[in-house]
Swiss-Prot record:
Chain residue numbers at which the record places covalent cross-link Glycyl lysine isopeptide (Lys-Gly) (interchain with G-Cter in ubiquitin): K310
Signal peptide: 1-24
Membrane spanning stretches: 437-457
Carbohydrate-modified residues: N106, N298, N352
Keyword terms, alphabetized: Endoplasmic reticulum, Glycoprotein, Isopeptide bond, Membrane, Signal, Transmembrane, Transmembrane helix, Ubl conjugation
One Gene Ontology CC term in the entry: endoplasmic reticulum membrane
Stated name of the protein: Dolichyl-diphosphooligosaccharide--protein glycosyltransferase subunit 1B
Primary location: endoplasmic reticulum
């Protein structure tokens, strides 16, 4: 705890020294409102900005700054330009990309937001920014018994970190319950129920930073998938086979002492409040042949609900998960090929499927998606709305001659917001669909010829 406060102090000192001799900015933030949701272990922050160009030249972009304690846990940043008011408000997505600044103070991280059109001198633009943080709630105490609730720390700043002068700003922090052990008070600040309000603060210089710490109760399931490998195998004969291998852990306060299943079943509201014994996976519609198993075998404690827009699989591991406990399991299912495989205007075929993890409110530390293309596929390419690591592999299956091309997509720090469609394009000649049937027919024909020859060949040494 003292070490964290020391790091914050050094960070603030460096920011003040940098801002003292920063050059004048062409932009300023007229008003900023930030709302931070701490209801689950995935921290969501909604930032509303009104930006003004106070320079003499048009501005085509602006910077969003994040402290080093957040940049390493930043899962996603999105920005929208807004026009109109209330029901007539329209939203236009903006291009947001990570960037580096040579004079960044103390490892501050930046994202560059490009405006739809350059912002002229004296003009203003309204933006709405969403950024998501993972692993930002620190359990304290770090170990709890089965009967104790989970308390966590959240570290942030009462004012937003920005390379621009901020005329007025307010921060609202929402906790999951009214139990708040303590919070840093930076006047004006007040707390009402589940909400803590910091501000309004006026005329804060660039790179202002006022650290705050909130200690509160959070018993939401800290479900963390250490590694998820999803294999999507395309068969032009009628279906997609999806196999998902999970290595799941509870990322909250570690469990100490003995586990009593009797207390867990009879006193569910107070025993193991931060544990979880069931998970919900949102699967595509029209799924079939669904199975759920672990190292021991199939698990029957699952319920599948199918619908027109989605399917939901609710299942229970063999034992409830407390802090520090882990479980490994596999989910598999099939979906109709015609729902996800299409033909582009240039003749190429492409798979349109959902990226991310089907489990609700789950962090995935490492996600690997393997798209297994039919044998004979060429020129594969993947299209995604964000950056991922890509590579090609080869997989051999039954009756394969040259193997099947596998498009491998890998991304770290994945959250539910990443569950968006992606496409994999490839070229395929229909003649290749006859390769495996031809091999089977050829094999049966050779066996038939060999059998026929064996019957008619005389192997006797002496002629009868």
């Amino acid at each position: 705890m003292a070490a964290r406060i020391g790091i914050f102090s050094v960070f603030v000192a460096v920011l003040l020294s940098i801002s003292a001799f920063s050059s004048a900015q062409d932009l300023q933030i007229v008003n900023a409102e930030r709302r931070i949701d701490l209801s689950s272990h995935i921290v969501k922050a909604f930032l509303t900005l009104k930006v003004e160009n106070i320079g003499k030249d048009p501005a085509a972009e602006m910077l969003l700054a994040f402290p080093p304690t957040q940049i390493k846990n930043l899962a996603m940043v999105q920005a929208l330009a807004t026009t109109g008011k209330k029901k007539k408000k329209t939203y236009l997505p903006l291009d947001v990309k990570p960037t580096e600044q040579p004079d960044a103070p103390n490892d501050t991280g930046y994202y560059r937001v490009t405006f739809i059109s350059p912002l002229g001198p004296g003009e203003t633009v309204s933006l709405e920014v969403l950024y998501i943080l993972t692993h930002s709630l620190e359990p304290f105490p770090v170990e709890i018994t089965q009967s104790e609730s989970q308390l966590v720390y959240y570290h942030d700043s009462a004012v937003i970190l920005s390379p621009y002068h901020v005329k007025q700003q307010t921060t609202f922090i929402k906790t999951p319950s009214t139990r708040v052990e303590s919070f840093t008070s930076i006047e004006p600040a007040n707390r009402a129920g589940k909400e803590i309000k910091y501000g309004p603060y006026e005329n804060r210089a660039s790179y202002s930073y006022t650290p705050v710490i909130i200690h509160f109760e959070n018993n939401s399931p800290f479900a963390v998938v250490e590694e998820l490998v999803r294999e999507i195998e395309i068969s032009h004969w009628g279906s997609l086979q999806i196999t998902e291998n999970y290595r799941l852990t509870h990322g909250g306060a570690r469990h100490k002492g003995v586990f009593s299943r009797v207390d867990y079943q009879s006193k569910r509201s107070v025993s193991g409040a931060s544990s979880f014994n069931a998970l919900l996976a949102v699967l595509p519609p029209r799924v079939n042949s669904v199975y759920y198993r672990d190292e021991i075998g199939n698990i029957s404690t699952s319920h599948l609900r199918t619908g027109f827009r989605k399917s939901e699989l609710e299942f229970e591991p063999r034992y409830p998960l407390f802090g520090g406990w882990s479980a490994t399991f596999i989910i598999g299912y099939r979906v109709p090929l015609e729902d996800y495989l299409f033909e582009a205007s240039d003749g190429r075929r492409y798979l349109n499927f959902t990226f991310g993890c089907p489990l609700v409110e789950t962090i995935v530390n490492k996600l690997t998606i393997k798209v297994v293309l039919p044998e004979g596929s060429k020129d594969p390419s993947a299209v995604l709305p964000f950056t991922v690591n890509q590579e090609l592999q080869v997989k051999y299956s039954y009756l394969d001659i040259v193997g099947r091309t596998v498009v491998v997509l890998q991304k770290d720090n994945v959250v539910p917001t990443h569950n968006v469609p992606f496409q994999v394009y490839y070229t395929f000649k229909p003649i290749y669909m006859l390769a495996e049937p031809f091999m089977l027919v050829s094999a049966f024909f050779l066996v038939f010829v060999a059998s026929l020859a064996y019957v008619h060949i005389d192997l006797n040494i002496v002629r009868k």
